[in-house]
């Protein structure tokens, strides 16, 4: 396995957990572009996807996952189980936390 395996389940089919390193997380907080936000407000009136916010959320989640993976690798893990997201928004600031349990797995 070349890269970090990340799953939302507590186990990985075909593997066994041989060591548990504990909780790991990656946190990203970003502010929205005020000029972009003004244009996106019109979308809330007429309906439809708000592309700017969708991209912001996607990028923020990807960054959070990357930071979580770095923390897990630093602990010696090769997988993360029970991965979840938590997010919050306050005014023009979006925060996303990716978290899970860092483990070492090996093929059965």
Curated annotation (Swiss-Prot):
Pfam families: YbjQ_1 (PF01906). SUPFAM superfamilies: YbjQ-like (SSF117782). Belongs to the UPF0145 family. This is UPF0145 protein llmg_1596. It comes from Lactococcus lactis subsp. cremoris (strain MG1363). The lineage of its organism: Bacteria, Bacillati, Bacillota, Bacilli, Lactobacillales.
